[in-house]
Design a protein with these regions (language model features):
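Sec-dependent N-terminal signal peptides of Gram-positive bacterial secreted proteins and lipoproteins
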Residues: 5-26
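Compositionally biased intrinsically disordered regions enriched in Thr/Gly
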Residues: 24-252, 260-263, 282, 376, ...
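Short, ordered beta-strand-loop transition motifs
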Residues: 36-39, 96-99, 179-182, 275-280, ...
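Glycine-centered tight beta-turn/hairpin loop motif at sheet-sheet or coil-to-beta transitions
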Residues: 38-40, 117, 286-292, 298, ...
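Short helix/turn-capping signatures at newly exposed starts of structured segments
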Residues: 71, 229-344, 380-388
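Long, charged/polar, surface-exposed segments that mediate recognition or autoinhibition
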Residues: 103-111, 117-158, 295-356, 361
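Short, exposed beta-strand-loop hairpins at the edges of beta-sheets
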Residues: 363-365, 369-378
Length: 388
């Protein structure tokens, strides 16, 4: 009995310590700073650093981890060697999430090891409560089952779709580097394993809803703290979240917004295929896991790319606050979003003109934009479109 009482006391103490850690983070102003070194127009090393933690030792530990995860010290040393000639640039994206997590990616491009230009994608997924690097197994209830499910999805769904657009196309084994994004698990591959035709390191994002059966969605788990629950489950709050995001001209997980320059986006992400025509103009497919089965809609390019902007975003894969392509039924979203502002039948002729299948489209007006939800003849969501 004494042993059991002691265990209970220790468990309570551990719970209190976790609560204290959470409170201390909430009460401090934690920020992410851009740090780096610019030696020339061709040599620029930039990386993130976390500041503002009450625990200075923890802050140092986290920043050391960020540099280690992303090879920053090696890049700084290499930059010094290239002063007399050569190119090396790093850039990062990410930051602190609401759940006290630091998530970032670093892209390094140039003469990283030899004079031959190449690219490396790396990432950091750090729990700010204790500074530990989040492991893949922390995301799942059964890691072995999750790995099997991921590999099956990569080989059966992704590989056939992308193989013609890749220089190196080994989607398995699962790479070590990954990013815990709000909308899915993004895998970052070594360039020798998976690379695009433009010789850039490949990445693949798998929507969390595709792995729903094995996700650890416990209350204080990593994915719950990341906000994955609200992204894959349709709930009463989904309508307001959709309105908030779409009112900004965006869809979750897509690094483009309505009004963005098509020229700048194609320069940054590169074309996967030549622009395809549709009833309203052209559809752009870009390289990278964040754009898989996602298309940017614009005009007919009569004035040239440099004058064209994004007029719409179309997702044929992914999830937006419970609207999961290939899974959510029309009756389900009607029960949460209510009746649409308008609706239309999509005939075979209309479907062919828009590169979609026959069915129905529901239109919801949110601010300056219109959310279009396409369902097939069986009532399953097949595409999400946000347009002007």
């Amino acid at each position: 009995m004494k042993c059991i009482r002691r265990i209970r006391q220790l468990s309570c103490l551990a719970a209190v310590l976790v609560m204290i850690a959470g409170c201390s983070l909430a009460e401090t102003e934690i920020r992410v700073e851009d740090r780096g070194l610019d030696l020339s127009d061709e040599i620029s090393i930039h990386y993130p650093a976390v500041t503002g933690l009450a625990d200075a030792e923890l802050e140092e530990q986290i920043n050391d981890r960020i540099q280690q995860d992303n090879g920053i010290r090696d890049y700084l040393a290499r930059a010094a060697q290239l002063i007399s000639g050569g190119s090396l640039k790093t850039e990062w994206a990410g930051g602190i999430t609401d759940g006290d997590l630091f998530i970032c990616t670093v892209s390094a491009e140039g003469a990283l090891e030899t004079t031959r230009s190449t690219q490396v994608l790396t990432a950091s997924n750090i729990d700010l409560r204790d500074g530990h690097e989040i492991r893949l197994d922390e995301l799942f209830t059964d890691e072995a089952a999750a790995r099997e499910m991921i590999e099956s999805y990569l080989e059966n769904e992704v590989a056939p779709e992308l193989s013609a657009h890749l220089q190196n196309s080994e989607v398995t084994p699962i790479p070590e580097a990954f990013v815990i994004e709000l909308t899915g698990l993004r895998l970052l591959y070594p360039v020798k394993q998976l690379s695009t035709l433009s010789d850039r390191a490949g990445d693949i994002r798998i929507g969390w809803y595709r792995l729903r059966e094995v996700l650890d969605l416990s209350e204080d788990g990593i994915l719950s703290r990341r906000g994955v629950n609200e992204m894959i489950d349709l709930m009463p709050e989904s309508a307001e979240k959709l309105k908030g995001t779409t009112a900004e001209g965006r869809l979750p997980g897509i690094p483009a917004a309505i009004g963005d320059s098509m020229q700048e986006l194609t320069d940054r992400y590169h074309l996967l295929t030549d622009p395809d025509g549709y009833e309203g103009g052209r559809m752009f497919a870009l390289e990278g896991g964040m754009f898989r089965k996602t298309y940017l809609l614009t005009d007919d390019l009569g004035a040239g790319w440099e004058n064209s902007t994004v007029q719409g975003i179309r997702m044929d894969e992914g999830c937006a606050y419970g609207l999961c392509v290939g899974e959510t039924l029309r009756d389900e979203w009607l029960s949460v979003l209510c009746e649409p502002d308008s609706e239309a039948e999509i005939s075979e002729e209309k479907a062919e003109a828009n590169r979609i299948v026959p069915g129905k489209c529901d239109y919801y007006n949110y601010g300056d934009y219109r959310l279009q939800l396409y369902s097939d003849e069986g009532g399953t969501l097949i595409s999400i479109v946000l347009a002007e």
